Amino acid sequence: MRHALPIALPLALLLASPPALADEVPGFDRPGIGFGTDSVPRGALAVEIGLPGFQRERDRDGQRSTTLSSDLLLRTGLAPGLELQLSSTPWLRQRQRGPDQPRTRQRGAGDSVVGLKWAGPGSTDRTAWALLASGVVARGDAAFSDGRQYALAASVEHSITDRWSGALYASHQRGDGQRSTTWSPSVALAASDRIGLYLEAGFTRARHQPDLSVAGAGLTWMLRPNVQLDASFDVGLDRDSPDLQLATGIAFYLD
């Protein structure tokens, strides 16, 4: 029950709050591997919730695992173009089974992370960029923690036409003797005023770890001007990557 509160509280705020009054709602960071280039204005709040997502994978030794998780991201503006982010994975359930081994189950919470997002100068209506620096401030349960990690990421978005856009995301993460670099290209289509579609690929190269490659697609639907629903999937492109990742979520903006 203690991990359910961070998810239930934002949902209660959504149901109790009127629509945002801002002329333009900034873009949300979910779904997808990367993040958006918009920043939340000072005094406003964006809440982005991952409803239980699913991941299935098998390693080279034949051990299979399935994971259910729910994540939470809070974004609030500190100054024009600068926002504070707080994120965590308060709910995790994992089941593992290896060859000739009994099935094991684990539950708990992941790490909590603080980040600063800066929407860089020089952005235009056609091309925009942003940086995100983040670090773990509270470790989760041992089975789900990556230890003290710090990351610097960048995202660039370019509008090709009124409906099509492309983006490139890159990040470098290190800590606790680990080091990894991820990059992800994507292309998005505004199918209508309320529905968006995207395709993405992601590639991670880690120190002393196998390289990972995935590709997938997603859908966003603006339920209200300040409320977004999403669904997405990624599949592994090699034997070391997760076989399948499924995610759904909701995001809302309060001004």
Can you describe what each PLM-predicted range is?
Residues 1-8:
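Bacterial N-terminal signal peptides that target proteins for export
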Residues 16-19:
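N-terminal signal peptide c-region/cleavage motif recognized by signal peptidases
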Residues 22-255:
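Transmembrane beta-barrel domains of Gram-negative outer membranes and organellar outer membranes
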